[in-house]
C-alpha cells in the first residue's frame, strides 16, 4: 500500500518527496495515478461521493509532480477529468463537508493551491468554503472534525486554509492561535488522546509558519527556551525517520511525511518561498506579503499571542540538507520494501 498510487500513504509520500526536490522520476507515478483515477471514474463515476478529500489529496499529488489536476485523464464519455472542479466547487450531489470539516478545509487548500478561479455558476464559491470553516469555529477558538470539543490537528489545518485570508479574519485566527497555545504542553508538544503526537505538532508548525511566523517568534508557542522545532526532533529515530509517538519503537511513514512538511514550512517561512502547498500560480501569497499580526487588524480582538523578539534571531542552518537526507532515507526504505515485497 505504501508504493501504490492512489493510496493515502503513497500519495502523501510522493507529494512530500517532490516538494523536497528529491531527484526521482515521477512520471511513472503520475501515469499510474492517472490510470487509477480513470478506472475509478469509469467504475464509480468519480473518486468518492462522500470523502471529498480523496480529490484534494490527489490534486495536490498532481500539482506536486508537475501535472494539471484540471485535466488529468479522460472520462468514459471522452471529456477531461477535472479533479479541482469535481472535488471542490462542483463536488457531487452531497455536501462538500459531509465527511467532516476537513472536507471544507482541504477543498479550500486544494483550490487555492491550484490557483483556479471558481466559475460564477459553480455549486460552491470560495467564500462559501471560507464561511463554512469560519462558522464551524467553537467559542473557545478551536475547530473540530464534527461539532464538539476542539481538535488540535483540525484547528491547525483550518488556520492553514485561512492563511491567505488572514487580514479579513483576524479575530478568528487570533482566537484559534490562543487556543492552540493553551493546548501546548510544557514540552512544546501537543497531545492526541493521552499521548504526545508528532503529527499534531507538525500541523501546528505548518499553521504558524503559513501565517509567516517563525516557530520561535510567538511567546505562546515557546516553553523554557524550547520551540516546536526542538520538540519535533525528539520524535526522530536513529535512522532519521520520525515516530508517531515518542514511546513508539519504530518510525511511521505518515509521521515522517508530516514532519518533512513541517520542516519545509519552516524553510519556506525563513526564505520567503511560502507555505508548503504554495505552488507556482497558487493563491497562497509570498511570505513577504502575508504577515499576520495577531490581534492587530480589528478592534476588540482577544489578547494577542505576542512576539518574542529574541527566540528566532538565529538561522536554521542546514535545514535544507536535513530535509534532503530524511527524504533520501524514505526513498531507500521504500525501494527496499518494493524489492523484497
Where are these regions (language model features)?
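Long, well-ordered core segments of solenoidal/helical folds
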Residues: 1, 25-48, 73-97, 122-144, ...
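An alpha-helical repeat/solenoid feature that recognizes helix-turn-helix modules
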Residues: 2-25, 46-71, 93-126, 139-175, ...
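Compositionally biased non-globular segments, especially hydrophobic aliphatic-rich helices
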Residues: 205, 302-304, 323, 330
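Juxtamembrane/start-of-transmembrane alpha-helix segments at the extracytoplasmic/lumenal side
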Residues: 307-322
Amino acid at each position: 500500500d505504501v508504493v501504490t498510487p492512489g493510496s493515502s500513504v503513497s500519495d502523501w509520500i510522493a507529494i512530500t518527496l517532490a516538494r523536497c526536490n528529491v531527484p526521482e522520476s515521477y512520471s511513472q507515478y503520475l501515469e499510474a495515478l492517472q490510470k487509477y483515477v480513470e478506472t475509478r471514474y469509469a467504475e464509480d463515476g468519480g473518486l468518492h461521493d462522500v470523502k471529498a478529500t480523496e480529490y484534494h489529496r490527489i490534486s495536490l499529488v498532481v500539482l506536486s509532480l508537475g501535472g494539471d489536476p484540471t485535466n488529468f485523464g479522460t472520462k468514459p464519455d471522452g471529456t477531461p477529468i477535472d479533479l479541482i472542479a469535481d472535488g471542490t466547487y462542483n463536488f457531487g450531489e452531497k455536501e462538500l463537508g459531509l465527511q467532516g470539516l476537513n472536507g471544507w478545509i482541504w477543498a479550500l487548500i486544494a483550490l487555492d493551491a491550484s490557483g483556479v478561479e471558481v466559475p460564477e455558476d459553480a455549486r460552491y464559491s470560495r467564500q462559501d468554503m471560507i464561511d463554512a470553516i469560519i462558522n464551524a469555529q467553537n467559542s473557545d477558538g478551536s475547530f473540530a472534525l464534527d461539532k464538539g470539543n476542539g481538535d488540535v490537528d483540525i484547528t491547525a489545518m483550518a488556520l492553514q486554509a485561512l492563511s491567505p485570508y488572514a487580514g479579513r479574519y483576524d479575530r478568528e485566527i487570533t482566537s484559534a492561535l490562543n487556543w492552540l497555545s493553551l493546548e501546548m504542553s510544557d514540552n512544546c508538544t501537543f497531545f492526541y488522546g493521552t499521548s504526545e503526537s508528532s503529527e499534531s505538532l507538525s500541523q501546528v508548525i505548518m499553521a504558524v509558519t503559513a501565517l509567516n511566523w517563525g516557530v520561535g517568534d510567538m511567546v505562546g508557542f515557546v516553553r523554557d527556551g524550547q520551540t516546536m522545532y526542538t520538540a519535533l526532533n525528539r520524535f526522530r529515530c536513529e535512522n532519521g525517520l520520525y515516530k508517531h509517538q515518542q514511546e513508539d519503537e519504530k518510525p511511521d511513514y505518515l509521521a515522517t511525511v508530516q514532519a518533512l512538511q513541517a520542516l519545509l514550512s519552516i524553510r519556506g517561512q525563513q526564505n520567503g518561498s511560502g507555505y508548503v502547498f504554495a505552488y507556482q500560480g497558487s493563491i497562497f501569497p509570498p511570505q513577504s506579503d502575508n504577515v499576520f499580526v495577531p490581534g492587530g487588524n480589528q478592534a476588540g480582538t482577544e489578547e494577542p499571542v505576542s512576539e518574542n523578539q529574541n527566540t528566532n534571531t538565529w538561522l536554521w542552518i542546514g535545514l535544507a540538507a536535513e530535509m534532503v537526507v530524511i527524504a533520501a532515507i524514505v526513498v531507500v526504505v521504500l525501494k527496499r520494501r518494493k524489492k523484497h515485497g
